[in-house]
């Protein structure tokens, strides 16, 4: 239904939480969410979540939670397109404290 990378689509709302579906490829932007945790569930491919002091590899079927206030940068390797579900509060800004060319203000709904 959509082809643009780093452009999540909202697929559900549960109370004050939203579920987003995104295709990602390459490197995103370093950012953090001051007041919200963010959960990534990899449904296709392998995601590298870069933190200031480490890199976590998240394989298909696995999840990672990025705690609020923690700088992070999701990356995919070797041109791989990765599909993820994101679980976060409705108040969560896409690129947190950073404005970037990939920043999305309003998520399209599927």
Name each model feature, range by range:
Residues 1-20, 29, 99-110:
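A short, N-terminal "cap"/entry segment at the start of jelly-roll beta-barrel domains
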Residues 7, 17, 26, 54, ...:
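A generic "binding-loop/recognition-motif" signal
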Residues 10-12, 22, 29-34, 51, ...:
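Short histidine-centered beta-strand/loop micro-motifs
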Residues 12, 73-110:
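Double-stranded beta-helix
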Residues 13-15, 34-36, 43, 68, ...:
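Short loop/turn positions at the edges of beta-strands in beta-sheet-rich folds
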Residues 19, 37, 81-82:
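Structural motif
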Residues 23-24, 33-51, 87-89:
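Short, conserved beta-strand element in jelly-roll/cupin
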Residues 52-69:
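Short acidic-glycine-tyrosine-enriched beta hairpin
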